[in-house]
Amino acid sequence: VDGGGGGERRHVTAQIQPEDLPALAEAGFRVLINNRPDHEVGHGENDAAMRAAAEAAGLEYHYNPFTPGQITPDMISEQARALASPGPKVAYCRSGNRSTVLWALTRAGLEPADELIATGAQAGYDISGMRPLIESLASRGR
C-alpha cells in the first residue's frame, strides 16, 4: 500500500528485522509503525528490540499491536496518530495484511471503501472482508 492522501509516502510490508532499519532510514523513511504483537515474535524482533533499533537508525517508532480479530477504536486512533507523523512511513506486521487493514480503517470516511479495498488489492492484500467495518466507520464519521 502506498497511499493515504496528501501525496506522502505510506507503505506496509511484512516482518522486518532490526538490521533492516538503517536501510529504511537511508531510503528516506522517517516513521516505523510496528503492528506485530510481541507474543508472535522472538526476542530479537519484539517491541523493545525494534524500538531500540529504530531509534538508533533515527526513525520515529510507534508500537500498535494488532491481534487478528481484535480491532478496537483505540487501535484505529493510534494508527491514525502514527500515520499523521511527518515524513515517509512504513508499517509492518507478519505479512503486511493487518497493517493494510489498519491503514484502510484510518481512511474510512475520507476515501470510498472501493478505493481503499482496490489500493490494498493493488499492493497484494485482499482486505475486501473489511468492507462492512470500513463502511460502518465511514457512516459514523469514524
Mark where each language-model region is.
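Glycine-rich, phosphate-binding/catalytic loops in enzymes
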Residues: 48-51, 107, 111
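Mobile, glycine- and charge-enriched loop segments
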Residues: 1-13, 20, 59, 138
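Cysteine-based protein phosphatase catalytic domain of the PTP/DSP
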Residues: 13-82
